[in-house]
Swiss-Prot record:
Keyword tags: Developmental protein, RNA-mediated gene silencing
Biological-process GO terms, alphabetical: regulatory ncRNA-mediated post-transcriptional gene silencing
Annotated Gene3D superfamilies: 3.40.50.2300, paz domain, Ribonuclease H-like superfamily/Ribonuclease H
Organism: Caenorhabditis elegans
Identification of the protein by name: Argonaute protein wago-1
Gene that encodes the chain: wago-1
Biased composition (Pro residues): 1-20
Domain Piwi, first and last residues per copy: 636-899
Region: Disordered, residue numbers: 1-41
Coiled-coil regions listed: none
Compartment annotation: Cytoplasmic granule
Amino acid sequence: MSPHPPQPHPPMPPMPPVTAPPGAMTPMPPVPADAQKLHQSTGNDACIKRLQQLNVEDGAKMYMKPTEPGKMGRPVDIQTNVFGIEVTKETTVHRFMVHAKADLTSTKEVTFTKKGKEDFVVQDRRDKCCNIFFLAVEKNPEFFKMKDGNQIVYDGQSTLYTTVNLFSELDANGTKSKVFQINGADTGNDDLKTLPCISLEIYAPRDNSITLSSENLGKRTADQNIEVNNREYTQFLELALNQHCVRETNRFGCFEHGKVYFLNATEEGFDQRDCVDVGDGKQLYPGLKKTIQFIEGPYGRGQNNPSLVIDGMKAAFHKEQTVIQKLFDITGQDPSNGLNNMTREKAAAVIKGLDCYSTYTNRKRHLRIEGIFHESATKTRFELPDGKTCSIAEYYADKYKISLQYPNANLVVCKDRGNNNYFPAELMTVSRNQRVTIPQQTGNQSQKTTKECAVLPDVRQRMIITGKNAVNITLENELLVALGIKVYSEPLMVQARELDGKELVYQRSVMSDMGKWRAPPGWFVKPATVPDLWAAYAVGNPGCRFSIGDVNQLVGMFIDSCKKKGMVIKPPCETGLYSTEKIMTQLEKVAASKCKYVLMITDDAIVHLHKQYKALEQRTMMIVQDMKISKANAVVKDGKRLTLENIINKTNVKLGGLNYTVSDAKKSMTDEQLIIGVGVSAPPAGTKYMMDNKGHLNPQIIGFASNAVANHEFVGDFVLAPSGQDTMASIEDVLQNSIDLFEKNRKALPKRIIIYRSGASEGSHASILAYEIPLARAIIHGYSKEIKLIFIVVTKEHSYRFFRDQLRSGGKATEMNIPPGIVLDNAVTNPACKQFFLNGHTTLQGTAKTPLYTVLADDCKAPMDRLEELTFTLCHHHQIVSLSTSIPTPLYVANEYAKRGRDLWGELTTKGPIEAKESQGERLKELTKEIGYKQTDLNQKRVNA
């Protein structure tokens, strides 16, 4: 089969987002898809470079015009968490920059308005900036035009808005800058009182005025041409609505993306149960996430209305407590006589990176924790200036007259003036207002946090209303009244539609009800054949209570059930029990003996082996199905038939079978279309900067899955791509792999390609329209100019929540949440683009998070009903459990391939990082070949089922 290289195009004008296929163009010789350079300077470099090589113009940064809302399904009233905003008058606001700094010494300066990353630093600087700035306002009312009724909106850092121009009467030099000298002692902030001269500068940038009016908001915020929309209106509204929180730093913790947490929650009207202790010296704080969104509103197409979307949430914070107490909470052991190495490492991971403070020098001194030292204050000695040595315990007794209560406890390692120093844990206190980061979580605490944060719809609604009142987003807020900003008290009610359940086709058909169904007895649609050479092994720690008899009993039940489903299976060649040390050697041995399938039963406590199984599977092409011993016990000892059914569903799909299809009465799943899901696994948090600086490869992993093999079967692979890219040059590899496989299996090219793409925020839509979609079209047109493209971005990273109209407390999550099939394609959608929300699944815990689908390209001009019906149908193709999924199966499977790619990359780099050579793109292509599935026999099987 000959490959189809993309044909480079001569330069042409930018394409509008909806185009007929361009006419014939002069072909030019293809340029090889070469290397992206080692460090990309923007998130689009790789895509832009490839477009230039192919001589393809960038696309226009234009959304598609919304089409008429869909009509299928029955109407349902839905409550939202969207509060309408009315701008009742015209107000001109002026933006100024604020800069606050002070000299600590003759050579060292501190800048308070500098942006920070760590929670404590962000909160601390905001607190100080507010103290400094509002003192300046109080002492200089003439400059700040307070008598003229000036309204001030300040972000607690470097941005200030006022309703009166502060520089209307310029001095002779026309300087738009004013510097105030502030005495830190007057601010009321203990940390500032030793600074007699703090410099606060206010200056005006160019073009620093906008006029806030309902007309301007309507015209300048939701245009199809993304580049003409003015983000400053959004920024100003968000700041105005957050002003109460910014000024009251002792009550509210303000964080990124409109998040606010309540530091004294019970005083703000929250329940004690909203603030539970989750272990490790950590406590949940309730909070809100507030975002300004421009929506169509209740009056339909062509309207643009500002709104405030408020979601309730909780996050774990570190308690303000001594580090010694924190160590006790983490370990459950008395730390006064020191911790053993394993416990110390566990505790160190939880406190590393935290800000803590001491007060024994008669002032508050902040330091950052780096770890826990293996020795105590009595055993750690250091040299004094006179050449003598003394222990840390003696030093504190002599210098500070402190007799340590726990002299044999481990010391804490802190960064102090650039060096690591050692401090008694009892004298250091964890600073408040620090959220628990992912590396600081422990298993138990993480589980408890997840459970407590998954609140039911009635609780979430209570949190939203309580929080909205606490942050003073009310009709009585004087600042908002003065600015003419009115936020409605009641959230928007909208009419959604509920699509019908689906018919699942096994040997006989069943209907889904509320996203669930029971598979009928009888054969799979396409039963697989289990390879003749297969084995079953259990691996466990001593005392895991799973015997060889249990293995054989499970295997007997497994074979019996496989046969009932029509699968061809013989008894295994071998069964056995192995220790963790010996199992990998055994698997290597049987793989070398041409064994093609192994059923592994692994102790729940053993988590490191799974990745090793998968690396061996990819390398040897011996399929390894891994299940937990708890699941095996549920089958063997508790007789759980459904668990066994799910295991066999997995086996059949892994071996290339198909369990069921979805009836396609509406003809949305036609044979001539290729449906591709594309998911992204970004490098682990915090590793990008570190790895890039050391010249190590740290790729993002693009998973993809499509129905290239057969219409209802979704199989895929992954590619390694440079990290830090908003647009995917790898869309080229994804499309070539998928189209080639489609042509190989279907003996024809697809007429339509539908891409569901995740991992893209609204902010990257413009770049995807400009670079990624033109690249995708160029690759597709290399096969045929007749193939049409539909490109849909899918995200759950938004703040919208939808609730049933009538909520009764005390029910289950499945009863209280909106049902599967709820679709919304007007009222709450962005008026500039073709968009819909579709709830595909039954929510088993917490409150439903309904995915948002934005159609960025549609050559077919598909009606909304058609896209919604296809998407909902695709939510029923999971094959393993008898439940619909929240996102379409191709995207779900693609995300699993991205995770699998991350695991295989992790195994590849266990022996050490891989150096980034000059041509990073080529190196990543080679490594993709090495650890991906394309070169293996598994590339047509869904091995990650």
